[in-house]
């Protein structure tokens, strides 16, 4: 699937279109060729998208894990927001009757949710702030498995990267707002993004077609091996004005810890030239935005792409391997 975009990868880019009948992919090397898939991009007004893949036009510190005593739970419950049931953390504001509500919910309310009294003027509860500084709070994802308790200053940073937070749809550039558990990610992709093809095996060919399309374009497909699923992403974007670049990376449909057990190699090969990148796959919890921003992936410009392309089609050899721990 494809839909070139002039607004770059941050634009809304649909990630699931029913593909027309498959086209014949570019043939890989004749000597014991690995599995191959064609990933096509189609220009405006075109509907030709091979069934092999999706093309989309167009990131804790401290604490502990000791058992929480009933007394500690009773103390932290005093900080529960009556609206969202998260914890009220400093700066702590109260209504005129002394009831607490977290700062996020307070901005949406016109009166106290407990007594219906006025929330203004803002009254600071310094005593509760001192107590909060002496208490370790559970992670907001404790109900899904996180056992850490943290100082209130460490809690927001940890929760931004907590392994137990919900997984978002990993489809890059898509407008899909789905969130769910890790176990539900593949089911979501298979049902909501059916145009993303999965190839079996640790050594495959990722063939992106129509790489000369203008604007920002993403090519996506899946690779299944070693009992896991990997997402292969090739993005073309204008990182600098007038200078388009390609970024290729592999993500694991799994946690960061699981990703450390694998390595991947991306290789452009042809015309007696070779360009190789080897790295550890990123977890889909991390996404691709940070890797692209830091060029922590296979990066090449359009001039290099044309050295390896054949009639506007670019084949990338992808090899997944396990790491000895």
Curated annotation (Swiss-Prot):
Modification Phosphothreonine occurs at: 24, 120
Residues binding Zn(2+) 1: 139, 146, 158, 162
Entries under InterPro entries matching the protein: 7-in-absentia-prot_TRAF-dom, SINA-like_animal, Sina-like_RING, TRAF-like, Znf_RING, Znf_RING/FYVE/PHD, Znf_SIAH
Reactions the enzyme catalyzes: S-ubiquitinyl-[E2 ubiquitin-conjugating enzyme]-L-cysteine + [acceptor protein]-L-lysine = [E2 ubiquitin-conjugating enzyme]-L-cysteine + N(6)-ubiquitinyl-[acceptor protein]-L-lysine
Pfam family, one: Sina_RING
Gene3D superfamilies attached to this UniProt entry: Apoptosis, Tumor Necrosis Factor Receptor Associated Protein 2, Chain A, Zinc/RING finger domain, C3HC4 (zinc finger)
Biased composition (Pro residues): 17-33
Disordered: annotated segments: 1-43
EC number(s) on file: 2.3.2.27
Chain residues that bind Zn(2+) 2: 169, 176, 188, 193
Induction conditions: May be induced by p53/TP53, suggesting that it may be required to modulate p53/TP53 response. The relevance of such activity in vivo is however unclear and may not exist. Induced by ATF4 in response to the unfolded protein response (UPR).
Molecular function via GO: ubiquitin conjugating enzyme binding; ubiquitin protein ligase activity; ubiquitin-protein transferase activity; zinc ion binding
Chain positions found as Phosphoserine: 6, 16, 29, 69
Protein name per the record: E3 ubiquitin-protein ligase SIAH2
Organism: Mus musculus
């Amino acid at each position: 699937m494809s839909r070139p975009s002039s607004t770059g990868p941050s634009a809304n880019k649909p990630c699931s279109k029913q593909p027309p009948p498959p086209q014949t992919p570019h043939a890989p090397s004749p000597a014991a060729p690995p599995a191959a898939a064609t990933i096509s991009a189609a220009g405006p007004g075109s509907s030709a998208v091979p069934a092999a893949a999706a093309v989309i036009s167009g990131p804790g510190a401290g604490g502990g894990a000791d058992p929480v005593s009933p007394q500690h739970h009773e103390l932290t419950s005093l900080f529960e927001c009556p609206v969202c049931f998260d914890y009220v953390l400093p700066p702590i504001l109260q209504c005129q009757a002394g009831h607490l509500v977290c700062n996020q919910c307070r901005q949406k309310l016109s009166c106290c949710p407990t007594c219906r009294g006025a929330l203004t003027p803002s009254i600071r509860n310094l005593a509760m702030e001192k107590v909060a500084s002496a208490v370790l709070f559970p992670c907001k994802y404790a109900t899904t498995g996180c056992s850490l308790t943290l100082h209130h200053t460490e809690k927001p940073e940890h929760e931004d990267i907590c392994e137990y937070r919900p997984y978002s749809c990993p489809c890059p550039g898509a407008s899909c707002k789905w969130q769910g558990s890790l176990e539900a990610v593949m089911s979501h992709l298979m049902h909501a993004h059916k145009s993303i093809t999965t190839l079996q095996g640790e050594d495959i060919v990722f063939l992106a077609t129509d790489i000369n399309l203008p604007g920002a374009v993403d090519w996506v497909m899946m690779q299944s091996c070693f009992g896991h699923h990997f997402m292969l992403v090739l993005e073309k974007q204008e990182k600098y004005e007038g200078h388009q670049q390609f970024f290729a990376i592999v993500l694991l449909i799994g946690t960061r810890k699981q990703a450390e057990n694998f390595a991947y190699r991306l290789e452009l090969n042809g015309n007696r030239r070779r360009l190789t990148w080897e790295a550890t796959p990123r977890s889909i919890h991390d996404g691709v935005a940070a890797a692209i921003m830091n060029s922590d992936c296979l990066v090449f410009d359009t001039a290099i792409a044309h050295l390896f392309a054949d009639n506007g089609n670019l084949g990338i050899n992808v090899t997944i391997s396990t790491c000895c721990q």
